[in-house]
Design a protein with these regions (language model features):
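Membrane-interface helix caps of multi-pass small-molecule transporters
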Residues: 3, 7, 26, 30-34, ...
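Membrane-helix interface residues
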Residues: 8, 35-37, 108, 129
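Alpha-helical transmembrane segments within multi-pass membrane transporters and channels
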Residues: 10-48, 93-99, 197-198, 202
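Transmembrane alpha-helical segments in multi-pass inner-membrane proteins
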Residues: 15, 146-208
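Helix-loop-helix "hairpin" substructures at the membrane interface of multi-pass membrane proteins
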Residues: 15-16, 24, 83-169
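Transmembrane helix-bundle core of multi-pass membrane transporters
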Residues: 39, 50-107, 137
Length: 208
């Protein structure tokens, strides 16, 4: 995302980052479903390969900055509607939009099948649902959202570092635990709200 933004395409960088994330999810799913690689190991293998791919996308530099380049945030600031809150407002709009789409998707037939696969894969298979498809789509969607988040954060911070994702899995789990403690478990709506609220609370506590 930052590399495309540095090349003068900040808006195009967002869907490009999501597509790249979906491709990474597909590779992880392929390793799991077709090659029989355990899920944790498949994620590690994919993440290791992505390190080199990210370096190549960043022009073989460990850090890329956008200090003198346009981003989606500078374009949004040009509207002169929200003053100094423009970054918060745009990030919130993107978060709400992504959350709404995810909630809708999880209520579709495919979305319900993905959720059921996570609960009981054997039951899903017995119900004539292909678990390979649900695992693949689930990983593609989740990694696309990861790409979206990384793209937005990179453009907001006006920089990208090759090591910026270090420890993000632990942080994500912490956010999820905090969110589920506050919101509780249950429907897809609660799950999405738990992730968003948990992330906000975690960052607030981290800043304090």
């Amino acid at each position: 995302s930052v590399s495309l933004a540095a090349a003068g395409h900040p808006i195009l960088a967002i869907p490009a980052a999501m597509a790249a994330g979906a491709c990474a999810g597909f590779v992880t799913a392929f390793l799991q479903t077709k090659l029989g690689v355990p899920s944790i190991l498949a994620g590690i293998v994919t993440n290791t390969g992505l390190y080199t791919i990210n370096l190549m996308a960043m022009g073989w530099s460990s850090n890329v900055n956008l200090l003198k380049q346009e981003t989606i945030f500078t374009k949004f600031r040009a509207l002169n509607e929200f003053g100094g809150w423009y970054e918060f407002v745009l990030a919130a709009l993107i978060t709400v939009a992504a959350g709404a789409v995810l909630i809708w998707f999880l209520k579709t037939r495919l979305g319900l099948s993905i959720r059921a696969t996570g609960d009981n894969r054997d039951m899903v298979k017995a119900s004539s649902v292909n678990p390979v498809l649900t695992v693949t789509v689930g990983l593609c969607v989740s990694n696309a959202l990861t790409g979206l988040a990384g793209a937005v954060v990179g453009q907001m911070q006006k920089s990208a570092d090759i090591n910026s994702g270090t420890g993000i899995v632990v942080i994500g789990l912490a956010c999820l635990i905090i969110g589920e403690t506050v919101v509780g478990k249950g429907s897809g709506l609660r799950g999405v709200l738990a992730v968003i609220l948990g992330s906000v609370i975690y960052r607030f506590l981290y800043a304090v």
